[in-house]
């Protein structure tokens, strides 16, 4: 989360992942937490309907307005800003549809909206299959996420496979593995450097400068 919010900027918290991957539960728990929900007027955009439903009575404050978005054709800058203004929201939380490209949402952001945090959720056992069958979509999800949570993780899951899928897209994404009992393991797999530090001339691509320095 950004520490300082420029005047008139609308923070956006984006939650992406396939249907029933845990987005609704995480958002519900987040809005129940007074450390996140301290009374700011919040617009919650729900772009898909899964098995779980929101319980506004459990939110930390009654300051959240829920709006359903039924089609990708509704993801337009003017329409998004219209929904925000109707409830005078100071920030926006988005449960994004698991079959829509997150990049489409990024391109449709109204001028004063800024994504402050983006989380991706995936079921650990099924994600490699999704990745094999819908590679363009999983790539776009990972490319627009800062943090990915693989839930329903257990010892039968291939952690290295999950790690490699993520790292093939970005070395900067944080990875966590959540077990059924709620315990979380953070990814600590060390990746080889993407350049040869022993070469006579070290060739570093632009995206790898931060790793070098």
Tell what function each PLM region has.
Residues 4, 155-213:
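C-terminal accessory "lid"/substrate-recognition subdomains
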Residues 91-177, 182:
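Phosphate/Mg2+-binding loops and adjacent switch elements
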Residues 32, 62-66, 113, 137-141, ...:
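Short, low-complexity, polar/charged sequence segments that are solvent-exposed and flexible
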Residues 26, 42, 96, 130, ...:
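Generic detector of bulky aromatic hydrophobic side chains
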Residues 2-16, 21-117, 121-129:
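Nucleotide-state-sensitive switch-loop elements of NTP-binding domains
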Residues 33, 55, 68, 76, ...:
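Serine/threonine-rich low-complexity intrinsically disordered regions
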């Amino acid at each position: 989360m950004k520490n300082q919010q420029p005047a008139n900027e609308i923070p956006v918290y984006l939650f992406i992942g396939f249907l029933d991957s845990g987005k609704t539960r995480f958002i519900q728990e987040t809005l129940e937490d007074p450390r996140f929900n301290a009374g700011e007027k919040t617009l919650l955009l729900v772009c898909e309907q899964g098995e779980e439903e929101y319980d506004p009575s459990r939110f930390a404050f009654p300051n959240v307005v829920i709006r359903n978005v039924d089609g990708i054709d509704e993801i337009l800058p003017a329409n998004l800003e219209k929904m925000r203004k109707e409830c005078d929201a100071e920030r926006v939380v988005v449960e994004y549809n698991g079959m829509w490209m997150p990049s489409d949402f990024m391109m449709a952001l109204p001028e004063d909206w800024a994504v402050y945090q983006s989380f991706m959720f995936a079921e650990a056992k099924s994600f490699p299959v999704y990745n094999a069958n819908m590679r363009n979509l999983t790539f776009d999800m990972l490319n627009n996420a800062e943090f990915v949570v693989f839930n329903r993780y257990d010892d039968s899951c291939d952690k290295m496979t999950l790690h490699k899928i993520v790292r093939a897209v970005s070395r900067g994404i944080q990875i966590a593995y959540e077990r059924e009992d709620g315990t979380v393991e953070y990814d600590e797999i060390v990746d080889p450097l993407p350049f040869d530090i022993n070469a006579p001339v070290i060739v570093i691509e632009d995206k790898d400068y931060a790793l070098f320095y």
